[in-house]
């Protein structure tokens, strides 16, 4: 078979809808990156640095990430960066023999595994959304988003540690950490078969800049840096990340608002009679049967609103207050 035909058969592109609507589908931050911080980024840029292949990761960025992590057991050799958390995930699929994940989960795990031709195993979460018993070991990388995406619920420490004890490598995807506030990065004191992945896309309003980072053992970081592309995160993107960390209090205040809105929406949806998860992300998840879900999606299309559809239901990003009020009104009308 022609290699291009093979790729077309096994892989598929990540597609999004047009942005000519109220868009609550991709868990983007509803607040723009502050204009004064954009100005600061451009004041701090060195025009001469634009002509060179700039260091990635930038040592200054690594130091700021370490400060943000606020631990006493990590050093600069425990951190690297990626062109978004997605690149880190993609590269890890090249590093291990088999990728394992538990749907409903982040859809790109499957997309990336098929794109790179990786062996992968999908084992659904249990009915109560817990990690199932699974036969894994050395050579496997197990991807676990925590809080989970798309459901937003949190896995218990015991569930994560059960997988760590098998010897399989665990990629703990903490993309939504800031909206939950609890991390399992301390497992790195005990386990070398763990990498914690985070992103600047969600809480820091920098999805377009594509900056993620990974925290792991020195041995893993050394291997990752050998496999990833050189100069993988641009000078400008790294500067945006550094400025964001220098002004983290702005983003912490915004995150507080998003969390308050999430809890308000969860309370309202429960009162309406919807079955939802206890989401700890910047979104809510509503369980629905296929027929009801399709009717809701059509109803929202007539109102020019986009949410994300999954087999188990719909995921709704927390937006600005007026957007959240609007979606609640439409869900009440639909009910």
UniProtKB/Swiss-Prot annotation:
Family statement drawn from the similarity comment of this UniProt entry: Belongs to the class-II pyridoxal-phosphate-dependent aminotransferase family. Histidinol-phosphate aminotransferase subfamily.
Pathway listed: Amino-acid biosynthesis; L-histidine biosynthesis; L-histidine from 5-phospho-alpha-D-ribose 1-diphosphate: step 7/9
UniProt-listed InterPro entries: Aminotrans_II_pyridoxalP_BS (IPR001917), Aminotransferase_I/II_large (IPR004839), HisP_aminotrans (IPR005861), HistidinolP_aminotransfase (IPR050106), PyrdxlP-dep_Trfase (IPR015424), PyrdxlP-dep_Trfase_major (IPR015421), PyrdxlP-dep_Trfase_small (IPR015422)
GO molecular function annotation: histidinol-phosphate transaminase activity; protein homodimerization activity; pyridoxal phosphate binding
SUPFAM superfamilies tied to this protein: PLP-dependent transferases
Enzyme Commission designation: 2.6.1.9
GO BP of this protein: L-histidine biosynthetic process
Cofactor(s), names only, from the UniProt record: pyridoxal 5'-phosphate
Species whose genome carries this gene: Thermotoga maritima (strain ATCC 43589 / DSM 3109 / JCM 10099 / NBRC 100826 / MSB8)
Catalytic activity: L-histidinol phosphate + 2-oxoglutarate = 3-(imidazol-4-yl)-2-oxopropyl phosphate + L-glutamate
PROSITE patterns membership: AA_TRANSFER_CLASS_2
Protein known as: Histidinol-phosphate aminotransferase
